[in-house]
Amino acid sequence: MLGNELSKSDVEKEISEKGEYMQIHYLSGLLNKEIHRDTKKFIYLKLIEIYKKKNMLNDVAKMYEGIAGISIAFSEQIKNYLKATEYYIKAGFFDKADYSMRKALNEANSVEREEINFSVKDFYKKQAEEYERNLKRNSATRIYEKLLEMNITDSERKEIKERLIELYEKLGKLKEFYAMKKFEEKEFSRL
């Protein structure tokens, strides 16, 4: 079956005998064809499933962006752009995460914007904590530095700076360590 007549069961049947990389090739090729929106969404979801198994997080994020692009409901667009943002953060592509977040914010009302900002902040924090657990200190440092650029509360800012000071010391980044330490002392003396 080709075109708009291609159904989910046709796709499922076609990929059932193929290996994962052949499934990726076949499904990716279908995305370029004119097919029904529901079938296209099914294909994106199948690709997400495969990419997650292969830990191809950047590609997972791209598929979520694809779903958002074909979605009609604003809530679904926001949800999928937010998922894309999460996976771009996990993959370490912060610029792409910012771009995807801006797309979600463009579709959101003021209440949803607050929720989106909170969620994205949470994604960054969780990823930084995971990096710290896995002793990927340099990656954790990059995320904490990114968080400092975001709209965060004073208590969050203080906590992040304390974490950064600790990480800079462990990484031997003395210049950054002393600069942050000096900045912290200045901030503390103002209180």
Language-model features, listed with the residues they occupy:
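Residue-level signature for tetratricopeptide repeat
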Residues: 13-14, 29-33, 50, 63, ...
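Inward-facing hydrophobic residues that define packing positions of alpha-helical scaffold repeats
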Residues: 27-28, 44, 64-65, 81, ...
